[in-house]
Amino acid sequence: MNEVLAKGKRAKEVARELVLKSTHQKNEALAAVANQLIHETAYILEENKRDIEEGKAKGFSDSLLDRLMLTENRIIDMTEGIKQLIELRDPVGECVREWERPNGLSIQEMRVPLGVVGMIYEARPNVTVDAATICLKTGNTVILRGSSSAIHSNKAIVAVIHRALKQTSLPEESVQLIEDTTRDSAKQLFTMNDYLDVLIPRGGKQLIDTVVREASVPVLETGAGNCHIFIDETADKQMAIDIIINAKTQRPSVCNAIETIVLHEKWAQQHGSELFSSLKERGVELRGDQRALALDSSIVLASEEDWGTEFLSLTLAVKVVSSIEEAIHHINTYGSMHSEAIISENEENVSKFFVSVDAAALYHNASTRFTDGSEFGFGAEIGISTQKLHVRGPMGLPALTSTKYVIRGNGQIRK
């Protein structure tokens, strides 16, 4: 039996043990993981340095190297995240609803772990810690499959987690790493229906699209973020500029940053030049349609491809429209159903936007940067779902649970 199948089989076995563990036992294990990460920081950083050196030799970009890099402070941040996770309410065992039937049957809908979670992701070794600890908190076993670029870091982190779990009542194989980083191992994970209950991809559009297209295992899709902000005719000028600057420039490489601004032509004629100047002062490259170019000749003419691109950089597309209907059509045509916003003082238009735009998170007079588990008050988050089944938006702890019905009677039979 090869590595992927063997670890899948073992994960299924361990899941039956893990479901019996109490919240106290799971929290003890999380505390042990946090302590062990601090205790073995030097070892983790040494292995991470190998990934960085290999990445430099392969010509990785500075942004990719930054995503790969671990530092003492980043490991401290990971452990602080685990401590916050310990404080969160455990959803497992929660009664979602209960009722009694006329025949005396008492019915409860209870939260239970999903079972075995597969996680396939790129570059960031911090995802190894996030996924492992969130799954432990929710009573799920997890099979991690990171990228070859972070293999030394991921192996070190999982080894540290195993040493921590050995000190607790939780099986160390609650967390397993697929060390084979070839495409064959990924493809095998896609079709492990006998062992995996769900597969969660985290990474770029190409990875996510590949998993969605090829996996027969149920997938929780954490989609790309081609996010828009529509500035309506009635939008407050300074509010609009401040929100656009924040949503684009605070952290341009994240999925909840905007990639296109859609401007009502009347607002653009009055305030567009000031908005464009503010963006260009911050190093933003603007790519617009012909109506945008008529307002500012320094804007580069956008291609059809630009409207559907998640730039993840200081590049921003600009679309000028004559109505809210045109804005909604553009957003629904090119958006990725992640986060979309309207800046407006017209409540009728806001209501129309909220009803008509298809996305996981919709904003009125606020930045799309708030689409995040911690900002929503969920605490930990394993990703942001852009699909409609099971869960949508930031996936907090309840997203890693399912439900079962528990029915209590006193001898009832169906007539």
UniProtKB/Swiss-Prot annotation:
It holds the Pfam family Aldedh. Its EC number is 1.2.1.41. One of its GO terms (cellular component) is cytoplasm. GO terms for molecular function: glutamate-5-semialdehyde dehydrogenase activity; NADP binding. The keyword Oxidoreductase applies. Pathway: Amino-acid biosynthesis; L-proline biosynthesis; L-glutamate 5-semialdehyde from L-glutamate: step 2/2. Coiled coil: none annotated. Transmembrane segments: none annotated. It catalyses: L-glutamate 5-semialdehyde + phosphate + NADP(+) = L-glutamyl 5-phosphate + NADPH + H(+). Catalyzes the NADPH-dependent reduction of L-glutamate 5-phosphate into L-glutamate 5-semialdehyde and phosphate. The product spontaneously undergoes cyclization to form 1-pyrroline-5-carboxylate. Belongs to the gamma-glutamyl phosphate reductase family. This is Gamma-glutamyl phosphate reductase. The gene is proA.
